[in-house]
Every structure is written in C-alpha cells, then in structure tokens.
C-alpha cells in the first residue's frame, strides 16, 4: 500500500533536473543518488506540509482550547523545520520545484475548502476542524514516509523520511491523547436547548 502510493506519485510527478550553470558531469554526480521516488516524495510532502502549516497558523486567534492551541503551535514549528529540510533536499536533487500539486486536494492533504472553513470558524468548531485535519495529515504523511524509506535511494531523502515518520508518530500519539480527553459529550450528561419565547433554556438530564 505504501510503496504503491509512492509509485503512483512517481508516474505523474517525476521531473528532469536542470543544470543551470553547472557542468553536465557535476550535475549528474550531484543528482545520481536521487531516484524518481525520492523526488516525487519531496514534491508531494512540500505542499502537504505547507497546507498543514497554514492551518496551524490559524489556531492562536481561533482556538478555544489552550491544549489544542499548544499542540497546533508545536506542530507548526515542526512543519516549518520539515519544510526547510525538504526544500534543501529538493535543491540538492537538482529537480526544480514545478509545483505539480498546486491547487490539488490530495489524500491526507489539508484541503482548500478545509482552510476556508477553519478561517470562518472559532472556538470548538475550529478545534474540531483542526484536530480532524491534522489527524488525516499525520496519517498520510507517515504512510508516504514509509513508502519513501522502502523505495527511495538518496540517503538525504530516506533519512529525512525516517525523521519525519518518527516525529509524526509522536504527534499522532499526542493528538489522539488530546482527542480522547475531550469527547464530544463529556460524561453521561446530555444538554438539550429548548426555545422559550425569545429566550432559550438549557436543561440537563
């Protein structure tokens, strides 16, 4: 499953390296360690991380839960570092960033519609959007990293995939713990809101 997912990316995302002012021999030496899986993986992980980072950036002004805001802040910092390392690896490969997934909603990627909904939400609705979207992002990211480790060749790429996978597993664990501690309906109480003239009265049973 993991290898197949990355293999599909290879078909549509492989790009030819550009040499610029570098001699053909030097360029070939620099890029020979990177195979199609390496570059396809990097070209997908960059926009995935960018979208997730955009979502976490909304948390300080929209989250109602300090724990969710803290989780988003930590995730955002990690994503920024991941992006720095991914862009460095892409530069090392010699493959240009052609943005093959620009505007796409790939599996696990935070969708443009999700970003719009998150930007319009506040409080608990925002927290739910953020935690659901981050869970999907982390899960897909970990799967793609496993595929890269199995099928990639360049040490720079496979090593980065291993590091991101390890970090993502920790974030999934932290997110799941947070979600489990905050069920939609706490305890066994159920609150019903009933209209009462111009006012509303909440009853708990």
Label the predicted regions:
Residues 1-6:
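Sec-dependent N-terminal signal peptides
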Residues 9-12:
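C-terminal motif of bacterial Sec signal peptides marking the signal peptidase cleavage site
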């Amino acid at each position: 499953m993991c290898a197949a997912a990355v293999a599909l990316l290879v078909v549509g995302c492989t790009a030819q390296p550009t040499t610029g002012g570098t001699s053909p021999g030097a360029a070939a030496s620099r890029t020979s360690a990177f195979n199609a899986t390496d570059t396809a993986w990097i070209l997908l992980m960059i926009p995935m991380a960018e979208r997730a980072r955009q979502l976490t950036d909304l948390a300080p002004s929209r989250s109602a839960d300090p724990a969710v805001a803290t989780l988003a802040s930590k995730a955002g910092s990690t994503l920024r570092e991941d992006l720095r390392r991914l862009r460095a690896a892409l530069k090392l490969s010699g493959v240009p960033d052609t943005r093959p997934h620009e505007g796409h909603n790939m599996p696990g990627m935070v969708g443009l519609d999700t970003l719009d909904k998150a930007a319009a939400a506040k409080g608990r609705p925002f927290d739910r959007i953020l935690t659901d979207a981050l869970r999907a992002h982390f899960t897909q990211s970990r799967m793609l990293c496993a595929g890269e480790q199995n099928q990639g060749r360049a040490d720079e790429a496979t090593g980065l995939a291993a590091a991101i996978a390890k970090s993502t597993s920790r974030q999934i664990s932290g997110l799941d713990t947070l979600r489990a501690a905050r069920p939609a309906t706490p305890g066994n109480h159920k609150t019903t809101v009933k209209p009462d003239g111009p006012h509303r009265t909440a009853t708990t049973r």
